[in-house]
Amino acid sequence: MAAAALAPAAAQSAKGIDLENTLYLDVEYGRVVIEMRPDLAPNHVTRIKELVREGFYDGIVFHRVIDGFMAQTGDPTGTGSGGSGKNLDAEFSSEKHVRGVVSMARAQSPNSADSQFFIVFDDAPWLDRQYTMWGRVIEGMEHIDAIKKGAGQGGAVSDPDAIVQIRVAADVKE
């Protein structure tokens, strides 16, 4: 009985973070901690965790980075046109796209999100209710700010920074 009572606490860190719904995204500049929001986008969070646990994102570049707007990654081709091959239906919410929010990138169709995601550098209200928000940066936003920016409105980055690795916090033994 005592072990069962302790089980939920095992999934919480000393800081009260839900480790099963927290990502450690490591870049050259340091660790970024992302709190995932299964309450907003349960299917997206499930898929992101599947991809993370497969090592899908490790080594993938931030191919599109627009200063003052966002940093986009998650395309294994590094071109902005690739993905994992599995589209997800939109899970739009009323949450606001503010600094540090993590959302899925998509094509024209609302149901075309796959593996690409972006982190906003600043508030972006024009994205609200248009993109599936599945998390937010809770530590290390300065490392996202340090990512090399692209040129022009398209934000294509020559010699882009890459994700070193992403891990679900519950899977990391520290």
Locate the predicted segments by residue:
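Cyclophilin-like peptidyl-prolyl cis-trans isomerases
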Residues: 2-174
